[in-house]
Amino acid sequence: MAVTKLVLVRHGESQWNNENRFTGWYDVDLSEKGRTEAKAAGKLLKDEGFTFDFAYTSVLKRAIHTLWSILDELDQAWLPTEKTWKLNERHYGALQGLDKSETAAKYGDEQVKLWRRGFAITPPALDKSDERFPGHDPRYAKLTDAELPTTESLALTIDRVIPYWEEVIKPRIASGERVIIAAHGNSLRALVKYLDNLNEEEILELNIPTGVPLVYEFDENFKPIKHYYLGNADEIAAKAAAVANQGKAK
């Protein structure tokens, strides 16, 4: 039986992950720790013998720079890459830039958990006059008004990620190419929910750690056989738990 593999990587820790802020579409870079995580992800993939034919990432530098570090470790800096806003992090609306713990202290841990992890719940929306609205950013100049978010739930994130997966990424993998996707916590949660057919309660508890390669294996019918993280299991579990705890009051 032929096994097809796909590698997903959430970007390394960003400056705002480090500061415990809601980031969304705000274009912050990797922290020093994040750069180290990205290089380590590349080394893990190299040690396991992975090479790739094509890469996908978002239009946000924390994901792009993570991919660059990984490909540099693999000596594949030349790899053809497609950048798309459809793999961006979920847009956190008016929460973008706010401290997660302070927001939890104000609104309660449960409300912030729902904003962060609820399936169809959107954070408070931005006004289109707000400088954080993506309509003011030239990288989104070709998007329609309907495509420009003022806030997003995970359900809305799925609405842009999954068609891109089905129409663009999946056919490339099905043709035999080896693909890596470097993206974000929620765009990857959207894809994992779809691939693993998770329900709304299951996805609420799913946390993807930064900078750890997640490998999916598919059968000839493109059904997931299994998935697994590369690296030390205890360290990965601790990183996932840290992600879960970000939205709690101190």
UniProtKB/Swiss-Prot annotation:
It is an enzyme of class 5 (isomerase). The active site is at H11 (tele-phosphohistidine intermediate), E89 (proton donor/acceptor). Substrate binds at residues 10-17, 23-24, 62, 89-92, 100, 116-117, 185-186. It catalyses: (2R)-2-phosphoglycerate = (2R)-3-phosphoglycerate. Its EC number is 5.4.2.11. The keyword DNA-binding does not apply. GO terms for molecular function: phosphoglycerate mutase activity. Signal peptide: none annotated. One of its GO terms (biological process) is gluconeogenesis. SMART domains: PGAM. Pathway: Carbohydrate degradation; glycolysis; pyruvate from D-glyceraldehyde 3-phosphate: step 3/5. Belongs to the phosphoglycerate mutase family. BPG-dependent PGAM subfamily. This is 2,3-bisphosphoglycerate-dependent phosphoglycerate mutase. It comes from Yersinia enterocolitica serotype O:8 / biotype 1B (strain NCTC 13174 / 8081).
